[in-house]
Curated annotation (Swiss-Prot):
The keyword Transcription regulation does not apply. It is found in: Cytoplasm; Nucleus. Keywords: Cytoplasm, Immunity, Inflammatory response, Innate immunity, Nucleus, Phosphoprotein, Ubl conjugation. The intermediate domain (ID) is required for the phosphorylation and activation of IRAK. The gene is MYD88. It comes from Macaca fascicularis (Crab-eating macaque). Residues 32-109 form the Death domain. Adapter protein involved in the Toll-like receptor and IL-1 receptor signaling pathway in the innate immune response. Acts via IRAK1, IRAK2, IRF7 and TRAF6, leading to NF-kappa-B activation, cytokine secretion and the inflammatory response. Increases IL-8 transcription. Involved in IL-18-mediated signaling pathway. Activates IRF1 resulting in its rapid migration into the nucleus to mediate an efficient induction of IFN-beta, NOS2/INOS, and IL12A genes. This is Myeloid differentiation primary response protein MyD88. It comes from the Eukaryota. SMART domains: DEATH, TIR. It holds the Pfam family TIR_2.
Length: 296
């Protein structure tokens, strides 16, 4: 996958992309970009060169190197920064001499952009003349417009996740293992981990409510003895249960990852538990959890 040689025609510019957010690019294009840029070669600029052009610092690039798909993580991180757009991405690829990428992916990028524009136009046309209720996809107050690391500061494109992780600080090592197993593998799930994804400075109760109700499709509860003592975890769990009485929407998934001295919380006993402590089912644990989080 080398860059275009002297006989290669320059890549045609993709129209209508200069100001579109990177969210316009679907997973198919992102995966194909990764196929081109994840490969380290001596003859073509790879994802590290792109990261430098995007003004990522050395330590940030070293951190991205730990991921199975560094290009994908780079795009996710960059799209929350000022000036990030589809048009800017194409400019940087051109600057790096990756006309081969543009020639190969140009039509797909154009198609994604046109779909994005059409969707925006349709949503605009479907808006009522007088809005009777607040759109659930938009943060309810300005305070909640920029609460995660990849949020749109204006609140137009709030960051969304597959699952909110409810946990105690003492259980962070298991949460980190969850990140490795579910985000950095072929499951490619997106988890909301407060210590990693939430910006400081906003009321923790407001943030939790916004993320659990509006931004995350599921909530994983890491149950432990320390969890039972946490007021924050208690609030998050009860709030999630209130959104889906009787667990009809399979919104909440409890996890028991180590032996407990105290009784399992009665509020969660009626929900099927993902038990990491059972040696007979441990080999199926991550597959079961990933499939549960991937349900529509």
């Amino acid at each position: 996958m080398a860059a275009g040689g002297p006989g290669t025609e320059p890549a045609a510019p993709v129209s209508s992309t200069s100001s579109l957010p990177l969210a316009a690019l679907n997973m198919r294009v992102r995966r194909r970009l990764s196929l081109f840029l994840n490969v380290r070669t001596q003859v073509a600029a790879d994802w590290t060169a792109l990261a430098e052009e995007m003004d990522f610092e050395y330590l940030e690039i070293r951190q991205l190197e730990t991921h199975a798909d560094p290009t994908g993580r780079l795009l996710d991180a960059w799209q929350g920064r000022p000036g990030a757009s589809v048009g800017r991405l194409l400019e940087l690829l051109t600057k790096l001499g990756r006309d081969d990428v543009l020639l190969e992916l140009g039509p797909s990028i154009e198609e994604d952009c046109q779909k994005y524009i059409l969707k925006q136009q349709q949503e605009e046309a479907e808006k009522p003349l007088q809005v009777a209720a607040v759109d659930s996809s938009v943060p309810r107050t300005a305070e909640l417009a920029g609460i995660t690391t990849l949020d749109d500061p204006l609140g137009h494109m709030p960051e969304r996740f597959d699952a909110f992780i409810c946990y105690c600080p003492s259980d962070i090592q298991f949460v980190q293992e969850m990140i490795r197993q579910l985000e950095q593998t072929n499951y490619r799930l997106k988890l909301c981990v407060s210590d990693r994804d939430v910006l400081p400075g906003t009321c923790v109760w407001s943030i939790a409510s916004e993320l659990i109700e509006k931004r995350c499709r599921r909530m994983v509860v890491v149950v432990s003895d320390d969890y039972l003592q946490s007021k924050e975890c208690d609030f998050q769990t009860k709030f999630a249960l209130s959104l889906s009485p009787g667990a009809h929407q399979k919104r909440l998934i409890p996890i028991k990852y180590k032996a407990m001295k105290k009784e399992f919380p009665s509020i969660l006993r009626f929900i099927t538990v993902c038990d990491y402590t059972n040696p007979c089912t441990k080999s199926w644990f991550w597959t079961r959890l990933a499939k549960a989080l991937s349900l529509p």
